[in-house]
């Protein structure tokens, strides 16, 4: 939360949410409420209803990728707690991906070079 507070304008004065680690199959079952698409590859999500962060557990918790996933979902928690409004769900990702990339580099010296076209696609509202 300290890193988020220092690198964003969000209020971070909230209790930390619960973080649950799960294997891929149960995590995706939870995320999709039982109707998991064949090509799914969910790494984590923040549940608005129970204020819980769910992440895949294949990496040790101290691994940079696990830390990056937690930060990513923690940013969604902070967006929620700050009552940030979005035009669509995808728009929630617009600030989060670059912040996750920055965090991974600054804190863990981990380079995450995601595809910019993919980022634009998953972080923009559009007519689908």
Short names for language-model regions:
Residues 83-87:
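Flexible, surface-exposed loop/gating regions in the mature catalytic domains
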